[in-house]
Amino acid sequence: MKLKAIILAAGAGTRMKSKLPKVLHKVCGRTMLNHVIDVAKGSMVQECIVVVGHGAEDVKESLTPDVKTVLQKEQLGTGHALMMAEPYIDDGTILVLCGDGPLITEETLNRTVAYHREGNFKATVLTTDLANPKGLGRIVRNAEGQLEKIVEEKDATEEEKAIIEVNSGIYCFDGEILKEALPKLKNENAQKEYYLTDILSIIRNMGFGVGVYKLEEYEEIMAVNSREQLADVEAIMRRRIAKKHMANGVTIMNPEHVYIEKTVTIGADTILYPGVILTGNTVIGEDCIIGQNSRIEDTIIGDGVEVQSSTIIHSKVGNFTHIGPYAYLRPNSNIGEHVKIGDFVEVKNSNIGDHSKASHLAYIGDADVGQNVNIGCGVVFVNYDGKNKHRTTVEDNSFVGSNSNLIAPVTVKESGYVACGSTITKDVPEGSLAVARARQENKEGWTKRKGLLKK
């Protein structure tokens, strides 16, 4: 039987106090809405439909082409939102999800759908018990323990407010019965809204079975309505991600102080120190050490690499290379194996071959550096003429002395040497020493003549 997910994402989220639609706020690098869609696709769902409203165009742009959308022009309640998706409701199973609930898991969705189908229910609600249920809809059961109704707190009596079983906002419906029930929905409540929760009572009054599937933990159904709740949800997501990596053989020295996005891959026996930030489609190999306060974004790191307190963005680092401390690899830096990029070295849009090193205080921009090359302290690859960027090539086994400038476009041929303090404007031939600096002149007695002698 076909399973569709209708995801409610039309709300303004006024308590977020943000220009950004609520469902587009990110949790561990991915929007809340896309977290929900990912989970739906990872379960048994074959098709996702998102109900958009506030910030509709921005929300649509965040979605992949296979996700369909319907517009709720007026926000008249969750039931009204479901009405807008009526053209997509058929005789299969309809799973209704909340776009601001990113912690729901595939396992829970699969179990809920299985419970719904095996019990031959026409509607099922996912619930849990909560010690402090303030603000949430209460599950009212009859004497036999069956669902009688779901009542929103603003419409609840004092007796109903004392109930601790709460509504998750996640439902399963038989599509054919849901289509029959939707036209019967009324807005006779304190908010003058069409409550989705009333549909369950309607289906029950139609003579069909309504199921209640209770979760043991509240965590999965937490919704985000404020910045504080966003932080709470992200903390849980971070903990989940860290646990997954630790279960796969990664050592995380202080999981509460490491930020890893869901899309990151980390190899076994890698160690992460506090303050590490790993984002995007970063892949880190095995046996690496990622030192404190390192930030790595959309980068591929080989095996046995050590990164100390450095930033690496959109780059690639080969096996057994050492980066940092305080190095900065900007986009399109391709670093080979057994390379050393030391403290306060910046690399941008450059290729650096195996066994080469730039140990400290250098700028390597728009360069092609070969194997076994030494870049001395204070070397600058001068790549910009005020209008255009130009490339510099330093071939294998070359040596660039400290405090030298390589004015692009220029090439240092294989085994070429550049003397310290030189400004190179012409190609250096293979096996040659280039010296491009003024000759030293010593003026004897100058200090005494100027009255500067301290003795």
From Swiss-Prot:
Mg(2+) binds at D100, N225. The active site is at H360. Its EC number is 2.7.7.23, 2.3.1.157. Disulfide bonds: none annotated. It is found in: Cytoplasm. It comes from the Bacteria. Its cofactor is Mg(2+). Catalyzes the last two sequential reactions in the de novo biosynthetic pathway for UDP-N-acetylglucosamine (UDP-GlcNAc). The C-terminal domain catalyzes the transfer of acetyl group from acetyl coenzyme A to glucosamine-1-phosphate (GlcN-1-P) to produce N-acetylglucosamine-1-phosphate (GlcNAc-1-P), which is converted into UDP-GlcNAc by the transfer of uridine 5-monophosphate (from uridine 5-triphosphate), a reaction catalyzed by the N-terminal domain. Residues 1-227 are annotated as: Pyrophosphorylase. It catalyses: alpha-D-glucosamine 1-phosphate + acetyl-CoA = N-acetyl-alpha-D-glucosamine 1-phosphate + CoA + H(+); N-acetyl-alpha-D-glucosamine 1-phosphate + UTP + H(+) = UDP-N-acetyl-alpha-D-glucosamine + diphosphate. Gene3D superfamilies: Hexapeptide repeat proteins, Spore Coat Polysaccharide Biosynthesis Protein SpsA, Chain A. Its main location: cytoplasm. Binds 1 Mg(2+) ion per subunit. Pathway: Nucleotide-sugar biosynthesis; UDP-N-acetyl-alpha-D-glucosamine biosynthesis; N-acetyl-alpha-D-glucosamine 1-phosphate from alpha-D-glucosamine 6-phosphate (route II): step 2/2; Nucleotide-sugar biosynthesis; UDP-N-acetyl-alpha-D-glucosamine biosynthesis; UDP-N-acetyl-alpha-D-glucosamine from N-acetyl-alpha-D-glucosamine 1-phosphate: step 1/1; Bacterial outer membrane biogenesis; LPS lipid A biosynthesis. Residues 228-248 are annotated as: Linker. This is Bifunctional protein GlmU. Homotrimer. Residues 249-455 are annotated as: N-acetyltransferase. Keywords: Acyltransferase, Cell shape, Cell wall biogenesis/degradation, Cytoplasm, Magnesium, Metal-binding, Multifunctional enzyme, Nucleotidyltransferase, Peptidoglycan synthesis, Repeat, Transferase. The keyword Cell wall biogenesis/degradation applies. In the N-terminal section; belongs to the N-acetylglucosamine-1-phosphate uridyltransferase family. The lineage of its organism: Bacteria, Bacillati, Bacillota, Clostridia, Peptostreptococcales. NCBIfam families: glmU, PRK14354.1.
